[in-house]
Swiss-Prot record:
Keyword Cytoplasm: yes
Similarity annotation: Belongs to the CFAP91 family.
GO CC terms, sorted: axoneme; cilium; cytoplasm; motile cilium
Keyword annotations of the record: Cell projection, Cilium, Coiled coil, Cytoplasm, Cytoskeleton, Flagellum
Role description: Axoneme-associated protein involved in flagellum motility and central pair positioning.
Summary of the knockout phenotype: Knockdown of CFAP91 does not affect the cell morphology and the flagella appears normal in number and length. However, flagella exhibit an abnormal axoneme with a rotated central pair complex (CPC) and an impaired flagellar motility.
Keyword Coiled coil: yes
Protein name: Cilia- and flagella-associated protein 91
Subcellular location: Cytoplasm, Cytoskeleton, Flagellum axoneme
Gene name for this UniProt entry: CFAP91
GO terms under biological process: axonemal central apparatus assembly; cilium-dependent cell motility; regulation of cilium beat frequency
């Protein structure tokens, strides 16, 4: 995309209470009236904060400056005092040049202080019109090299302590100087406001207040209108810049499209040339091969026998096989035109044998249509125009559906390809814009049709002494005209002399040609006639060659078009086949993924069933057997205890015996049973874990089926 350099906004007119920036390139280099920047203090003190450029420092308005300002008398402009006229330095004159006509200068009355200063300066000027001038610099080694330090300015006695020209001290080149039209208008507005505020009445009566209010109100209304006009100019300038930017962007875009189109055109032409060369080489090779096969199939002459040799063929120059294969057969054998397409038998008639001979004089036949030989046939052809040739059907170049773009895999690639195609169509429409019908006027065309803004007239500076300069310039111009006329006269004299010499040489040549004899003239006429006959024969031969070439090119073009159509059909069939193969591969991949998923689920289901069966069988074989053994042991012990006599009397009578009996029961029955239970608890958990996992799996499988459904 094309980017423009960021430009600084235009300056804004000064008004009440804000800083104004005045900038621009349409400024004049010098201006005569002084610039009043630091003026009288007023109620709107912010109006003095003015910058003459975007980079110029703002002139500070210190409170001390307002405190020291006095208004005992009006300013120089209000008092009507006019300073001395400003004269530009005169140009150096030649020693022998005549002095200009004296012009009566306008008399100016100067104050007594300035009269003394002028006399003092005149005394320093010598009688020869020269004077010495010194320059104060800041780069010096000691004070003896230059004049003593002097102040930058001085104020005469009785002068304004705060002259307006001091506002130019901090202005430099490209930082407020040189002043232009906008700066001058700003200075005039400042002076107008100062004049209005100086004319305000100091009385406190109602009439004085009303009069002051009317003056200030009119001034504010006028400044408001000027400010609105300035904003309107800024908007117009901005629109012009946008218009130029749009035009530049369109030009850059057209240039890029043109370059891209030229590049594509060169590439396509190079590819076409390469294909044409390949097809030409193949055609020549195939033609040579066909001629060789036809010659090999042709029967031998009956008079010479089967292995007879033609004496004429033996003396012919044999073709170089290496050179023939190096050139791919081009130019090795001239194509022969025969009336028959295949070989015949040896018993064919002589008429048929003569028909198989090549037609060596085929170029002498005129292939031009018979109707083009007389005027009536040409008129009839012009009257009966064939619509099929004269005009083309509107749907002949209908753009088919772009399969190349639609076959792209991603949407981003299709969008980018569509954008490129649209850009190429846009470039084609731009190139053939005159052939397309008139379209609706767009916004950019309206911008282009808009006339360019006219530059305002630059303010001119009229100084004293311009009349003398005009007289001097007119005299100089008159001298140049006189000298130029003299040089022009010399040029025309030389031209006339050359013309006379040329006429003399032509007359001598004509006389020499007239002195020749009749035999020489007749020989020259015969030579010209022979040249004309040779030119006519050459033109006729050239016409025959061009006609044959065009005929061959027409048939070759038809063949190339058929080949291109077949190639397009082949590409289309390959694209359809590739698309179908990709679709089938995608379906196969989905089926394979589903099959693998089902196989994994089935293996997990079988493994869970096997774990459940194993856990159940283990529980059946181990736990049930132990329980049965435990029950049998308990039952046997109970039966044994029933058979023993009751020891209750002995136990109750003897406490030591009872204690021993309890200890024996604990040692033999209780403690071993507890120890066995503690040791067998992990093994029991290991046995019951698969059953618990199988139960959880059975509970989770119905939930998953319900979520899938």
């Amino acid at each position: 995309m094309y980017y423009r350099t960021q430009q600084k906004p235009a300056s804004v007119l000064g008004a009440n209470g804000f800083t104004a920036e005045v900038g621009g390139r349409d400024r004049v280099r010098y201006f005569r009236p002084p610039v009043e920047v630091a003026g009288v203090p007023m109620r709107y003190s912010g109006i003095d904060t003015v910058r003459f450029s975007a980079t110029a420092p703002t002139t500070p308005n210190l409170p001390r400056t307002f405190a020291e300002t006095r208004f005992d008398r009006p300013t120089s402009m209000a008092a009507g005092l006019v300073g001395p006229p400003h004269h530009l330095p005169s140009l150096p004159r030649r020693a022998g040049a005549a002095p200009p006509h004296p012009v009566k200068a306008k008399s100016v009355k100067l104050p007594p202080q300035r009269t003394k200063r002028v006399e003092k300066l005149a005394s320093t000027i010598g009688t020869d019109g020269k004077c010495d001038a010194a320059m104060q610099t800041v780069f010096r080694e000691n004070e003896a090299q230059t004049l003593p330090y002097t102040p930058n300015y001085y104020i005469p006695e009785g002068g304004d302590p705060n002259p307006q020209v001091l506002g130019l001290m901090e202005l430099h080149w490209n930082e407020g100087l040189p002043a232009g039209k906008e700066e001058v208008e700003l200075i005039q507005r400042l002076r107008r406001r100062r004049a209005v505020e100086a004319s305000l009445l100091d009385e406190t009566s109602k009439e004085a207040k009303m009069e002051n209010f009317c003056k200030l109100y009119d001034l504010e209304v006028k400044e408001r209108e000027e400010r609105e006009q300035h904003f309107e100019n800024l908007r117009k300038r901005r629109l012009d810049q946008i218009h130029e930017a749009l035009q530049e962007r369109e030009r850059a875009r057209d240039e890029l499209n043109r370059q891209r189109l030229e590049k594509v055109k060169e590439q396509r032409l190079a590819n076409l040339q390469r294909v044409i060369e390949q097809m030409e080489s193949k055609r020549v090779g195939m033609g040579r091969k066909a001629l060789a096969e036809q010659a090999s199939k042709a029967p031998a002459a009956a008079g010479r026998g089967l292995y007879a040799v033609d004496p004429i063929e033996t003396f012919k120059r044999k073709p170089d096989l290496i050179q023939t294969y190096a050139r791919r057969g081009t130019g090795a054998v001239e194509p022969q035109l025969c009336t028959n397409n295949g070989g015949g038998s040896a018993s064919a008639s002589p008429r048929r044998d003569r028909s198989r001979k090549p037609l060596r004089n085929y170029r002498q036949y005129d292939i031009q249509p018979a109707m083009l030989k007389y005027e009536g046939g040409i008129a009839e052809l012009e009257a009966n125009k064939i619509p099929k040739i004269q005009q083309i059907a509107p749907n002949a170049f209908a753009a088919p559906e772009n399969h190349a773009i639609n076959s792209l895999p991603s949407l981003y690639q299709r969008r980018e390809a569509t954008r490129v195609v649209e850009a190429l169509e846009y470039v084609h429409a731009k190139i053939h814009k005159s052939d397309t019908p008139a379209e609706t006027i767009r916004v950019l065309e309206l911008y282009r049709a808009t006339p360019r803004p006219q530059r305002p007239d630059t303010p001119t500076l009229e100084l004293e002494g311009d009349v003398n300069e005009a007289v001097e310039e007119s005299c100089t111009l008159l001298q140049r005209l006189l000298r130029g006329r003299a040089v022009q006269n010399d040029f025309f004299d030389g031209k006339e002399r050359c013309r006379g010499l040329i006429e003399e040489l032509q007359a001598a040549s004509n006389a020499k040609y007239a002195e020749r004899s009749a035999e020489e003239k007749q020989a020259e006429a015969e030579e010209k006639m022979r040249e004309a006959i040779a030119d006519s024969i050459g033109n006729e031969a050239q016409g025959d060659i061009i006609c044959d070439t065009l005929d061959y090119l027409f048939h070759e073009m038809t063949r190339q078009q058929d080949l291109l159509a077949l190639e397009a059909l082949r590409h289309e069939a390959e694209a359809v086949r590739a698309e179908r193969e990709a679709r089938e591969a995608e379906l196969r991949a989905q089926e394979r993924i589903l099959h693998d998923k089902e196989a994994v689920q089935y293996a997990a289901y079988v493994r869970a069933i096997e774990d459940i069966v194993e856990c159940y069988s283990h529980d059946l074989y181990a736990t049930v057997a132990e329980e049965c053994a435990m029950e049998e042991a308990i039952e046997a012990e109970c039966q044994r205890l029933e058979q023993l006599p009751p020891p209750t009397s002995n136990i109750l009578s003897d406490p030591e015996v009872a204690e021993n009996l309890v200890c024996d029961v604990l040692d033999n029955f209780v403690l071993p049973a507890v120890i066995d239970m503690v040791r067998m608890k992990p093994e029991e958990l290991d046995r019951k874990a698969p059953a618990a996992a199988a139960a959880g799996f059975r509970q989770r499988s119905p939930n998953e089926k319900e979520t899938k459904e």
